[in-house]
A protein has these predicted regions:
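Histidine-acidic metal/acid-base catalytic patches
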Residues: 1-93
Length: 93
């Protein structure tokens, strides 16, 4: 999302059969930690749906893996966190 060549790089990887996984989270701004303050889809500035469309157009048809490193979310009830993930994915993923 921050790389101006991202769409072209995704296409290149797809053309070479190198799209093996698609990990999803969002980047919160401002962030409190470079690794452990990721957000649910829709909480930050990453255009997840747009990137997903590029990945799928490049031939990826595997699972979308939600991967949210977050000290805040890890402290929550994980059943409730899972519900939030599902809701955010349906709306913004």
């Amino acid at each position: 999302w921050w790389d101006p060549q991202l769409e072209q790089e995704i296409k290149r990887c797809g053309n070479n059969n190198h799209l093996l996984a698609f990990h999803i989270c969002d980047w919160k701004t401002p962030t409190t930690d470079m690794l452990f303050d990721r957000g649910l889809m829709g909480e930050g500035c990453i255009p997840v749906k747009q990137i997903r469309s590029w990945v799928e157009a490049a031939g990826f048809n595997g699972f979308n893996e939600v991967e949210i490193f977050s000290n805040t979310f890890w402290k929550e009830d994980q059943e409730e966190f899972l519900k939030k993930i599902i809701e955010a994915y349906r709306e913004h993923g």
